[in-house]
Each structure stands twice: as structure tokens, then as C-alpha cells.
């Protein structure tokens, strides 16, 4: 599988209005993404910040062509809007990875798996790279995946 990854640092909610996003930001990005999709490349989009107001706009691609990696987006809403066409991943807060308790980490991961894992297409991961993660929190994340992160037929 060949993949192109994009770090989207300026498209987040609050950086520009929805009208500005749809006029200036999205058309050129979509044109590049469409070209790579035509070449058979999966698009991995790291949407830094919240993309809650952008979800309907970015849901314009063929099924299986895009994985959206979210930092601070409502994942249940992202699953509802994008889940039929796109994979989604992320949204375990770096602050939780670094300063949370293993119990809080496991509970948060379980919630994400239960909200987003139904029907497939969800990858549990941190929302961004965490500096100095607590090893016990990473273990709790793995435990949550082992306990709750499987697909039932």
C-alpha cells in the first residue's frame, strides 16, 4: 500500500471561516488529493486542531481512499459523517498520554473504541506525538486495544 501523508496545520476550525476554507484552502488541497487518488495512493490526512466544522466538506472522496488522522475533533461525529467512506484515527489527547493516569487512559481509549470502532475503519492512536509519554499510560492504551479493540461479526 502506498500512502501520501499531509500535515494540515492551517485548516483547523477557528483558523479561518468556513467560507474562507471552502474558497481558498479546500479546492487546491482537494485537487492535489484527487490527483494522487487517481494514481492509486491512499491519502493520510493529519488534521491538526479541531475539524468539527469541516467534516461535511472533506467527505468528498471514494470509499477507502482517505484516512483522516484527528487531533481534537469530535470522533463520534467524525465517525457518523466520514465512517462510511473514510477511515479515521487519533484523538487520544497528548496531555492524557503525558499526565493522565493509566485508568483514565484505558477509559478514554475504551470510549473511543466503542464510539468509533463499530463497523471497522477506526485506528486508535494519539492525536499528536507526545513528548515524554508515561510508559504506564502506553501500556494502558495497549491493554484497552487488547480488551476492547476487536471486531465482532
Question: Where in this protein do the model-derived segments appear?
Answer:
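Active-site loop segments of alpha/beta catalytic cores
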Residues: 1-153
Amino acid at each position: 500500500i502506498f500512502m501520501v501523508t499531509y500535515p494540515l496545520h492551517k485548516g483547523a476550525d477557528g483558523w479561518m471561516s468556513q467560507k474562507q476554507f471552502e474558497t481558498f484552502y479546500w479546492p487546491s488541497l482537494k485537487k492535489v488529493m484527487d490527483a494522487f487518488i487517481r494514481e492509486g495512493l491512499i491519502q493520510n490526512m493529519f488534521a491538526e486542531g479541531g475539524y468539527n466544522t469541516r467534516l461535511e466538506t472533506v467527505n468528498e472522496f471514494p470509499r477507502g481512499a482517505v484516512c483522516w488522522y484527528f487531533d481534537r475533533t469530535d470522533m463520534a461525529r467524525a465517525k457518523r459523517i466520514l465512517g462510511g467512506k473514510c477511515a479515521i484515527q487519533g484523538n487520544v489527547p497528548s496531555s492524557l498520554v503525558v499526565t493522565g493516569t493509566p485508568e483514565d487512559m484505558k477509559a478514554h481509549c475504551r470510549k473511543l473504541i466503542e464510539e468509533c470502532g463499530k463497523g471497522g475503519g477506526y485506528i486508535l492512536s494519539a492525536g499528536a506525538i507526545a513528548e515524554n509519554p508515561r510508559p504506564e499510560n502506553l501500556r494502558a492504551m495497549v491493554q484497552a486495544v487488547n480488551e476492547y479493540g476487536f471486531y465482532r461479526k
